[in-house]
């Protein structure tokens, strides 16, 4: 039961990556446009602001589409059904909530009762995905043949969404109250504690690939900001981009991603055995550069998480502390994708105490270096380059790596489902005993996580390219 639940949570996390992938362009447009830089003409700034706002204002619908595609192997019919489902469900909700809640009208202070936000999108996407997987091959009488098969899916999704809209009108008001209370607590009443917990838990979930789920309420839901033309923004990311002076509380990520972990990589390099230092130096500095520029940290984290888990526990705690430190020092900056140098520079228009980031970051980097160096030496932790025997294979092309992955996983007949997020392949296999984890690591995987018949292989930013090559090979029956 636990393995099935874990597998489903991984699918949700994987599905969330598609809508999240649109955030960089939306965030950059909104961030630059709303900053009103003097070198950019006013008309261009307005276009950028409106373009970015259009994405953030439609995030629930985008999430509905992403969830539907994630659970139906990217079938376009499920995406259409998700749009239909979300539209019908929200309109049904707007009519039935005043009836079931004994309210003649929804006033300004109660408008949250009608706003299901990202969660509403996830529900609509789940409905359409379930309907698709259940009915996409349905047969109907000949006189209704036009509506059989895939054409039946949007119709059924719409009808089911009316029922869900009525059900939600009863259960959503108390849920909405809880979400509103949590949102106000996290965004305004005690953000220091809220984001400290967020940071630690978010890092703790990374090994399991579930951190994308945990990110959603903090990044997309908490807080509310109305700009000068009446547009409403939810979540720390969108509120910061739109100019909300109370947002930007995700800034702690810059401290441990751009400074802390790169210094940890430096410590592991310095602790490597002399004969391995050259090889480890290249690996660690590549991971450090990736973390600094893009904020993608898995290549560094998975280099020590399995061989020295105590270091990861320390890292998760330090990552969590970075957020309240930034909040207490009133350091604010925005992120659209991950906390890297690109985000840091491009989205600096609405920042506060910008100059403090490198100072605090350098302090944090030295702290990381000292703790990692001490722990590795004191307890003889087998971080990269300190193993008794170590195998490094020559770097291969993406296509060669993809073919080897298929072979190591037991062949294409053993692969049931394949997907990828930013840094890892997410695969479901028929027989997990056919998977050779050691060979995957020798192939260059930073980490391999197995749960039931599910396996995650961390290849860093090349994961999606490898997934594409595997898809191409598996779809070509002549190979």
Swiss-Prot record:
Classification via Pfam families: PTS_EIIB, PTS_EIIC
Sites of Phosphocysteine modification: 421
Family matches, as CDD domains: PTS_IIB_glc (cd00212)
Membrane topology field: Multi-pass membrane protein
UniProt keywords, alphabetically: Cell inner membrane, Cell membrane, Kinase, Membrane, Phosphoprotein, Phosphotransferase system, Sugar transport, Transferase, Transmembrane, Transmembrane helix, Transport
Subcellular location: Cell inner membrane
GO molecular function terms noted in the UniProt entry: D-glucose transmembrane transporter activity; kinase activity; protein-N(PI)-phosphohistidine-sugar phosphotransferase activity; protein-phosphocysteine-glucose phosphotransferase system transporter activity
Catalytic reaction list: N(pros)-phospho-L-histidyl-[protein] + D-glucose(out) = D-glucose 6-phosphate(in) + L-histidyl-[protein]
PROSITE patterns for this protein: PTS_EIIB_TYPE_1, PTS_EIIB_TYPE_1_CYS, PTS_EIIC_TYPE_1
Domain notes: The EIIB domain is phosphorylated by phospho-EIIA on a cysteinyl or histidyl residue, depending on the transported sugar. Then, it transfers the phosphoryl group to the sugar substrate concomitantly with the sugar uptake processed by the EIIC domain.
Protein name: PTS system glucose-specific EIICB component
Organism: Buchnera aphidicola subsp. Baizongia pistaciae (strain Bp)
